[in-house]
Amino acid sequence: MSQRDAVRLADQASFGPTEALVTSIKAKGATAWVTEQMALKNSSYTSGKGGEIHQFTGSGDFCTGKGDDCWRDYYSTEPLLWDFYRNAVNQPDQLRQRVAFALQQIVVINNLDVSGNYGFRNYYNVLLRESLGNYRQVLKKVILSPVMGDFLNNANNDKDAPNENFARELLQLFSIGTCELNANGTLKGSACTPTYTNEAVRSYAYALTGWTYPAGGATSYGCYPTGANCRYYGGANDGDMVPVAKYHDTTVRPLLNGYTVAAGQTAPQALETVLDSVITHPNTAPFIGKQLIQHLVSSNPSPAYVGRVAAAFTSGKYLSFGTGQRGDLAATVAAVLLDAEARGDSVARSGGKLREPVQMFTGVLRGLNGATDGDALSWWWGETMREHVFRPPSVFNFYPPDYPVAGTALVGPTFGIHNANTALARLNFLTYLLDWGGTPAANSGVPSPVGTLVNLNAFVTDAADANVLVDRISMLALGNTLPTAARTEVVKAVSWWTASTDATNWKVNRVKAAAYLIYGSPHYQVQR
């Protein structure tokens, strides 16, 4: 396996190549490495507080007397963001984490409209656990999540006048999409044929009535409606919502794809019918499969590539991967990563994807032997780059999967958050790490603070020869040497630093210059 393909796979299936990871992939080969990754135990989210905020019945504000960090520690997802970046940079289950990150940008919740990090912790741990399981189970846990129920108004949804918000997004964003698709993801016909009607959304909303929060919540005002539970995201089974029969609609409800909720079905029975109707819908495999390709490999996959991935989703098998059950994510992800289009060296302008900010943060830190406690990557760099993890602006994520690239017929989802300001911010991030020294150990409120910084010592050994240094960092970041003209200019810039320009630090300054110019270049910013 070539250096280029090993680095490419590391880009697609991890949070960034390290020299050790690339060596491992080259030794094992793509299939064996993916197999090994799928067998690893998942990392998890552990930080944050419990559900006391939804059990408070006193007067005044819950945070009164609890210190300056109360809102952060109980209400916000910032503690989970610390875990996210620590795990992404350090933990071995790289593939599972990357797939879970893709899923959380498909089945979206956010910390702008809903608060309580203990509930978000449950939700994102489910995505980590199920990211290589089955998409039907992912959807089931999403439907039963009290955080999602709160976010999209399906918790305590009464049969008398059900809120249709969640039902609409279940169809539009989480499963079948809005237009009828061929198996290869292209439109059926010459224009969009809608996949559902308002009446269909209404039927799904009725079918999903009758779910309330798990027991355990309390307020000083009592719970509404009578017989339902108060807002609470904790408890057994990941905090899954529980059924309340009197609030569940038991009328016959026609669903899509030939399915019907029969008269008298309980809320759990109706849920299973809903799941069957969307997981077997012919749109779901190409709609979800294409988005996984876009998050991991390429913004503009060919229809043939989408078709092969959709076939793996439908059959539940790809090579030796999968259980044979429709929606198997291990089979689907293997098809995404091991397909010839993913493994090929595409130089076409339509190939690859703009590296999203999170990938840049983690890619540079991992490549340059860095460390982070996540603190600086939240409000500072996350907000600056418009990808503050766990805080997308809406259920439509940070960017849409069909965001158009101006002046072309291509889409570039990540360009939805890319502009002149964020382009400069990418370079400023490198300046922050390389010239400012990053951030020292964070405040004492962050557990095990290490700050956010890189360690360039391993590269200083090659700094005496600018050509060797530039090629080493290029081979790690890009999987290849820079194009000739670019390489010449980078070597020239790096060579400016000598013992005569800085007798003490010239070698480390060479490393900083090389890293800045390579990681800041279009050759790195566009993942191919």
Question: Model regions: which residues?
Answer:
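Active-site substrate-binding loop specific to GH73 endo-beta-N-acetylglucosaminidase modules
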Residues: 26, 38, 50-68, 72-85, ...
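Flexible, low-complexity segments enriched for small/polar residues
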Residues: 7-14, 281-285, 289-326, 334-528
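Amphipathic interfacial helices
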Residues: 76-80, 90-98
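Short, flexible active-site-proximal loops enriched in glycine and acidic residues
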Residues: 95-99, 111-118
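N-terminal mature-domain "stem" immediately C-terminal to a signal peptide or N-terminal signal-anchor/transmembrane
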Residues: 1-44
